[in-house]
Amino acid sequence: GSMQLINDERSAEIYDVVKSLSPSMVSGGSASNTINGLANLGINTGMVGMIGENELGNFFLQDMKNSGVEPHFFTSQSRTGSCISLIRPDSERTLATCLGAAIELTADNINEELFDGYDYFYVEGYLVQNAELIETALRIAHEKGLKTCLDLASYNVVEDNLDFLKTLIRKYVDVVFANEEEATAFTGKEDIEALNEIGELADIVIIKLGCKGSIVKWGESIT
């Protein structure tokens, strides 16, 4: 599966088709899921984002607070971003994403104070849709001495933004996360060869292998 960006109208059309399947509503997104997981381990976490002043926005805000995540959220008159996730029995998923208010977060919203008190900065590759925003955030985090982490998000995101992603990683990123498809899209290679090539740009590289675990390169060490 992959991720496709859609508008409000298309999102409503898809929801009309799938609502008979009794879908559930949960907070999600690559960064949100990661931060939630860390918060559940008792780690001090925060999240920066833009939400709408609507039911979805309130749900997301309260869910983050309930999980122990400190929200650094800006608000918009637009609808809160949402994603319809279609999951097959083999766990492959297709994501129909309407960015909504999320895409209105800009580089002007990012300041040094947002990073105070944190040691790591994690950003999802989907944010390359706003090149100025992702580069500004990574640059400031890097300059303030945080360890910066980037998840490549989806193979089609990698294919469409390959040169820009390589530049970002080379200049600002310490840790790269990718699954097998994303690593191959990034390098044209597989497994250890892909791991080593990405490792030329970042200090730590993690390639996720689903039920088989992960392979990790840290300096010269591979596990």
Go through each PLM region and give its residues.
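Glycine-rich phosphate/adenosyl-contacting loop at the front of the ribokinase-like
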Residues: 1-46
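Ribokinase/PfkB-type carbohydrate-kinase core domain
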Residues: 1-3, 23-26, 50, 61-76, ...
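A glycine-rich beta-to-alpha transition motif near the start of alpha/beta enzyme domains, typified by
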Residues: 7, 15, 19, 45-71
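Conserved beta-strand residues within beta-sheet cores
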Residues: 44, 81-83
